[in-house]
């Protein structure tokens, strides 16, 4: 498929379609002999399914005020590895979920998982909430520490790491959902935020939101709908679905963890989810904003992470290699800053520039030479996080 880069609007302000990105542009911005212009695609309705922090989805939410009645959205970074383990250690179907260590040692929160798959393979991962306060925290290095816990290490010793990946996660849940229908379009999946964070699962919810959109629009177009309308029927169908019920029952999970902390929040959620089945007669709200949670570096304790041992823990470069991503060198860097002065003039002295650490693939670096510090982007290391 082709990635959409811009929105196309009708004269009445409704979404008319999208424009795909140009291809064949050199790193200097010149057209190469392989140049292909973007295509303007029109549709009666456009379904936006870009995933977490989709650039068009963010634009639509802001333009149409879709989140004015919602609490602020919350995000996390999920890091995952696939391992081949010895047959005698394989427990097909075993599922382990965890919270607390190692993140709680640095005042952060999140969760972990370990799934025994087929063919002696294990998938493991760590989700780091992006409301942590210590700017020296590194999600990648926290994952490497996580694997040294005895309950995890017992399965990995003698095994081999096969793959690595990372992804941003929209995890605000039910309370942070924006209005998902707009004139000429619909938001689905993580573009809206349909992840069930209590279960650390979002594939089934994203699929269901897309199915509701397809059924709603098919019926409308079959009946002669000319397009461009704000389909309130989608919202109605969403409210009548099991998706709405599931997300509503998990509505207190994230706010409880953020407001009460890992242990008290965990106790509350155990009662809410397992005893009351998400049917408590009140709703917790979390009005905090993730990006405002960092303390200034001078007030935070620096974190020294152990070196990779090459057995259980690894460095970023060898991990990026296992993602099997590759980018054409001679193309524009799309990781552009609105204000290039912020990393060195604001973030570095105030926050020790956390972008050096919170991007798992190590895209941003600040090397120093005789001329001073330089904020450097290693585009070849980029994997599609959308942080």
Model-derived features: where do they sit?
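Glycine-rich, charged/polar anion/phosphate-binding loops
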Residues: 63, 99, 108-112, 169-176, ...
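Ferredoxin-type iron-sulfur electron-transfer modules and their immediate structural context
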Residues: 241-375, 386
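Active-site-proximal substrate-binding core of FAD-dependent oxidoreductases
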Residues: 193-199, 205, 211, 215-262, ...
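Short FAD-binding loop at a beta-strand-to-alpha-helix junction that anchors the flavin cofactor
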Residues: 118-120, 179-198, 357-365
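Flavin (FAD/FMN) cofactor-binding core of flavoprotein oxidoreductases
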Residues: 154-175
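Mid-to-C-terminal "cap/lid" subdomains and adjacent gly/pro-rich loops that border
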Residues: 77, 81-104, 113-116, 120-126, ...
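Alpha-helix capping and helix-loop boundary segments enriched in small/acidic/polar residues
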Residues: 70, 134-137, 176-179, 197-205, ...
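Predominantly flavin-linked oxidoreductase catalytic cores and closely associated redox partners
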Residues: 2-154, 194, 212, 216
């Amino acid at each position: 498929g082709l990635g959409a880069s811009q929105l196309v609007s009708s004269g009445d302000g409704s979404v008319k379609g999208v424009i795909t990105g140009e291809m064949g542009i050199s790193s200097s911005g010149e057209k190469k002999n392989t140049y292909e212009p973007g295509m303007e695609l029109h549709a009666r309705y456009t379904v936006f399914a870009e995933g977490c922090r989709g650039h068009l989805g963010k634009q639509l939410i802001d333009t149409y005020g879709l989140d004015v009645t919602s609490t602020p959205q919350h995000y996390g970074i999920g890091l995952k590895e696939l391992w081949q383990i010895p047959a005698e250690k394989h427990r097909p179907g075993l599922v382990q979920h965890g919270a607390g260590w190692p993140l709680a040692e640095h005042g952060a929160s999140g969760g972990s998982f370990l799934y025994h798959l087929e063919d002696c393979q294990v998938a493991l991962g760590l989700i780091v909430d992006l409301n942590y306060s210590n700017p020296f925290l590194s999600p990648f290095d926290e994952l490497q520490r996580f694997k040294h816990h005895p309950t995890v290490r017992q399965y990995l010793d003698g095994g081999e790491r096969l793959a690595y990946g990372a992804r941003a996660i929209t995890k605000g849940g039910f309370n942070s959902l924006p209005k998902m229908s707009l004139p000429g379009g619909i938001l689905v999946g993580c573009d809206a935020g349909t992840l069930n964070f209590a279960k650390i699962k979002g594939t089934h919810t994203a699929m269901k939101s897309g199915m509701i959109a397809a059924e709603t629009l098919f019926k409308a177009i079959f009946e002669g709908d000319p397009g461009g309308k704000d389909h309130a029927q989608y919202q109605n169908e969403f409210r009548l679905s099991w998706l709405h019920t599931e997300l509503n029952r998990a509505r207190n999970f994230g706010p409880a963890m953020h407001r009460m902390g890992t242990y008290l929040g965990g106790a509350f959620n155990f009662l809410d989810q397992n005893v009351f089945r998400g049917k408590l007669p009140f709703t917790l709200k979390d009005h905090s904003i993730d990006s405002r949670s960092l303390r200034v570096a001078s007030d935070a304790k620096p974190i020294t992470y152990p070196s990779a041992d090459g057995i259980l823990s690894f460095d970023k470069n060898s991990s990026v290699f296992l993602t099997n991503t590759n980018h054409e060198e001679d193309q524009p860097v799309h990781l552009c800053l609105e204000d290039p002065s912020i990393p060195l003039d604001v973030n570095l002295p105030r926050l020790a520039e956390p972008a050096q650490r919170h991007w798992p693939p190590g895209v941003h670096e600040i090397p120093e030479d005789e001329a001073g510090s330089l904020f450097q982007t290693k585009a070849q290391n980029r994997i599609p996080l959308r942080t």
